[in-house]
A protein has these predicted regions:
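Phosphate-/nucleic-acid-contacting segments
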Residues: 147-168
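Local beta-strand/beta-hairpin segments that build beta-sheet-rich folds
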Residues: 39, 70-71
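Regulatory nucleotide-sensing modules
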Residues: 8-60
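Short solvent-exposed loop/turn micro-motifs enriched in small/polar/acidic residues
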Residues: 24, 42-44, 64, 77, ...
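Short, contiguous pre-domain boundary segments
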Residues: 4-6
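A short beta-strand-loop-beta hairpin characteristic of the jelly-roll/cupin
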Residues: 57-69
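A small-molecule sensor/coupling module
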Residues: 21, 91, 110-151
């Protein structure tokens, strides 16, 4: 169980009705992770949805065998692991703690069960996830194009440019 006040600090949950915060507060856990803890691994199943209360998490993906791109540094108030909201989804990135992190977590399996029981909760959670996804995709597509424009030699090593942008 977590405090409703902590949940209200999460950007994706802005505008949530109070009664939905109560449901999430009962189901969520508070966890602390150390530096370099890998929370999500690319191409592996995502079973946990994370809402960062404190710390910083790097979201990265291999561009070439020698170069990783860090797409984002997730800060307090942000969420990640949205794939956990959909059954059978795998990660399209790796997420690693850059410092000690405190995160509210929700079991993907449990939140999907709650979605079936409470369609209003499903609506608000997935609406927040969709908004977050669009914002991130707009930013990341621009970052990729800028990196490739500044480093044209990398273009020959990239086989699927679309695959690079499919990171949430």
């Amino acid at each position: 169980m977590v405090k409703i006040e902590d949940l209200q600090r999460i950007t994706m949950l802005k505008g949530f009705p109070d009664h939905l915060f109560e449901i999430l507060a009962r189901e969520a856990q508070l966890n602390i992770y150390g530096v370099n803890t890998q929370l999500i691994t690319i191409h592996e199943r995502v079973d946990t949805f994370f809402m960062l209360i404190m710390g910083q998490v790097a979201v990265k993906k291999e561009l070439t065998p020698r170069v990783d791109i860090i797409f984002d540094y997730i800060q307090s108030g942000s969420s990640f692991g949205t794939s956990a909201l959909m059954e059978g989804s795998t990660a399209s990135y790796t997420a690693v703690c850059q410092e000690t992190c405190e995160a509210i977590t929700l079991s993907g399996k449990r939140i999907r069960e709650l979605f079936k029981e409470n369609h209003e909760l499903a609506y608000y959670m997935l609406l927040g996830a969709a908004r977050q996804y669009k914002n991130k995709m707009d930013i990341r597509a621009g970052m990729i194009m800028k990196a490739l424009d500044e480093n044209p030699e990398l273009k020959k090593d990239i086989h699927d440019i679309e695959d690079l942008t499919h990171v949430i």
